[in-house]
């Protein structure tokens, strides 16, 4: 018997169908000599501190650094702490039984770092030692699965991939557990999540927000001249930008006395615009955020659905290139797109033409090639799925199309001793840009009239423009993904820049989840398309901004090391020792922090309706300094929780709270409510009357 394990039931069923394993069993399919089972994502993970006999959120327990990591079935929240997920336990039992009945295993989890980790953790946890081989494919079409099954890879080829995934998993555990617990212990109330990648990402958002908020615009002035040639009127801007208004006014007056404008230089050149590279996941997420206002997480979710629907290749890719053998299949894919309504005409026009090979490079294909559509055409799709599919299909058409050719004319004019410039652009051959027909910034200029050096033109107008400098815009998800992807540009060390360019902060597969974590922790919110830190997020940032845990350069070093483990250049034990030292350092830094923590409840003040309720260690009060709403946390010897205060603020009354203590020591139960002046008062439960006889 041969066992096969997929990452999800849907994928396992497709593989089982192709293998002829059609008999349904409890948790697996059988037939034709195969037993095909599945995981539900991460069934096994690293054990929580309590599994090692360590009490969490105790100063004396930190740092938490196990001698060796224990694996445990996936955990779910219970009334007290966590417990094993019953569904995970059941499926792990099935997997063990399937493996025990088999002579070897075909690993068909996702062909990537996390897919490898999912299988290896299960394999270790159930104590299996059967030999295994790897199904490594980039799409889930029947053709791709069949070819993959005929070309199974030795499992040992992916040992370094697993070691890198394991090292990343353990590093995230050590930094996340210790950072979160140390800051929470120092704060004295609440849970404040930190992470190896999460914290530098929060720092990037907060840094940009504060730069934008504290930016002081500077005024400057520029002159705009108007002239005419061959009945075509156009304008040009002065090359000089004036910091002071008076010199600009003086120049304006001088030019007003002139009658003509001299053509100083005319530069004409043909510009060839190469087509864009194919999408990797991050580039797709950026484009979908800009054009469709989709979050990174939403885009990944839709792409995963299209992948499982056999319509696109593996989405969690970090490459924008395809290999030569995949390139040979592209003409067939383009013929298929002739039947797709939106792109049919354009795809038909590419038939017989030489395809652009800019996106073809065997040396730049990583675990998976760039995103492309498969040979399967979609039947019915939801609107959001269609939008993402069309981005990928359209980009594929662009990538293999001809260059866009433009005529660009740059003219320098002189008037009364001042220089002005204007640029015109005309598309001669649209090439790849005909796919979507979109204009680029600065292409609204009509073609400039023909001019030569020395031409004299009439001055038909001059005006003074008052402008001001602008701050860097707030981060959108699109520009944050760019910052995460190319954070190395902010570094001074050349070697680190190179490593960060390749690996960045996080990975293509994890960046969306990191951003979503910041939302779920209430560290950031969306304001239109912008990502804005909350009071809680800013408070955390103010604590960690000069600490190692928020250091982009340090994160880059770890990413570089993880990449070296994957390539076999670095021993994972060396990495582990370094991470342990790092965990001890950040724990010590955070435990030494002296702070009075303020976090935002997100609740509008019920009295003034303009401020927001802020949580402090001893009180909660309105952010509006002119408002008097204050709620003391300690009420009659009972410490109020954030949840109880939030309920009071939002509804005007809490549920029944047990355990208040009067001045004479008597324990009583009551609700809390606001009176007409928004003071907090007790509301006692109605006493049940004695039944009538």
Q: Which positions does each model-derived feature cover?
A:
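Conserved short loop/turn motifs at secondary-structure junctions
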Residues: 1-3, 110-111, 188-193, 268-277, ...
């Amino acid at each position: 018997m041969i066992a096969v394990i997929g990452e999800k039931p849907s994928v396992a069923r497709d593989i089982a169908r192709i293998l002829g394993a059609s008999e349904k069993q409890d948790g697996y399919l059988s037939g034709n000599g195969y037993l095909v089972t599945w995981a539900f994502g991460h069934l096994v993970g690293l054990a929580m501190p309590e599994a090692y006999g360590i009490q969490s959120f105790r100063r004396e327990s930190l740092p938490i650094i196990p001698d060796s990591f224990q694996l445990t079935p996936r955990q779910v929240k219970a009334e007290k702490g966590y417990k094993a997920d019953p569904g995970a336990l059941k499926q792990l039992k099935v997997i063990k039984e399937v493996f025990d009945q088999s002579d070897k295993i075909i690993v068909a989890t996702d062909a990537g770092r996390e897919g490898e980790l999912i299988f290896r953790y299960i394999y270790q946890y159930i104590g299996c030692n059967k030999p295994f081989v790897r199904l490594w494919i980039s799409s889930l079409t029947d053709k791709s699965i069949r070819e993959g099954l005929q070309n199974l890879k030795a499992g040992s080829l992916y040992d370094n991939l697993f070691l890198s995934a394991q090292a990343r998993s353990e590093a995230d555990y050590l930094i996340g557990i210790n950072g979160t617990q140390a800051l929470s212990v120092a704060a004295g109330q609440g849970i404040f999540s930190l992470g190896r990648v999460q914290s530098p990402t929060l720092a990037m958002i907060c840094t940009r927000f504060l730069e934008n908020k504290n930016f002081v615009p500077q005024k400057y002035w520029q002159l705009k001249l108007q002239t005419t040639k061959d009945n075509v009127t156009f304008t040009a801007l002065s090359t000089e930008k004036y910091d002071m208004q008076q010199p600009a006014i003086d120049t304006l007056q001088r030019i007003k006395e002139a009658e003509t404008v001299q053509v100083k230089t005319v530069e004409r050149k043909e510009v060839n615009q190469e087509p864009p590279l194919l999408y990797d996941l991050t580039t797709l997420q950026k484009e979908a955020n800009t054009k469709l206002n989709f979050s990174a997480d939403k885009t990944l979710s839709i792409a995963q659905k299209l992948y499982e629907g056999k319509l696109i290749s593996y989405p969690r890719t970090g490459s924008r290139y395809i290999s030569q053998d995949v390139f040979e299949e592209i003409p067939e894919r383009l013929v298929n797109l002739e039947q797709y309504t939106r792109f049919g005409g354009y795809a038909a026009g590419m038939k017989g033409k030489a395809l652009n090979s800019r996106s073809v490079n065997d040396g730049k294909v990583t675990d998976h090639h760039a995103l492309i559509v498969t040979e399967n055409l979609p039947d019915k799709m939801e609107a959001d799925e269609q939008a993402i599919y069309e981005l990928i299909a359209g980009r594929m058409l662009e990538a293999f199309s001809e260059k866009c050719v433009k005529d660009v004319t740059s003219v320098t004019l002189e008037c009364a001793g001042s220089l002005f410039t204007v640029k015109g652009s005309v598309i001669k051959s649209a090439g790849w840009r005909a796919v979507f027909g979109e204009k680029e910034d600065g292409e609204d200029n009509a073609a400039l009239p023909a001019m030569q050096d020395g031409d004299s033109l009439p001055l038909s107008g001059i005006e003074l423009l008052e402008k001001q400098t602008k701050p860097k815009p707030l981060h959108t998800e699109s520009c944050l993904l760019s910052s995460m992807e190319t954070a190395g540009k902010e570094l001074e060390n050349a070697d680190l820049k190179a490593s960060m360019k390749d690996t960045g902060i996080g990975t293509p597969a994890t960046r969306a989840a990191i951003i979503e974590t910041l939302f779920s922790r209430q560290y950031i919110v969306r304001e239109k398309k912008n990502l804005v830190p909350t009071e809680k997020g800013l408070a955390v940032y103010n604590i960690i901004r000069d600490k190692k845990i928020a250091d982009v350069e340090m994160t880059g070093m770890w990413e570089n090391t993880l990449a070296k483990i994957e390539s076999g250049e670095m021993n994972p034990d060396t990495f582990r020792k370094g991470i342990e030292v790092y965990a001890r350092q950040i724990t010590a830094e955070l435990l030494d922090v002296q702070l009075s923590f303020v976090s935002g409840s997100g609740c509008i003040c019920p009295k003034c309706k303009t401020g927001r309720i802020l949580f402090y260690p001893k009180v909660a009060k309105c952010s509006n300094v002119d408002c008097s709403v204050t709620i003391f946390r300690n009420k009659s010897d009972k410490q109020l929780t954030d949840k109880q205060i939030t309920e009071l603020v939002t509804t005007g009354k809490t549920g029944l709270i047990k355990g208040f203590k009067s001045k004479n020591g008597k324990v009583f139960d009551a609700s809390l409510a606001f009176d007409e002046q928004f003071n907090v008062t007790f509301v006692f439960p109605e006493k049940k009357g004695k039944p009538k006889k």
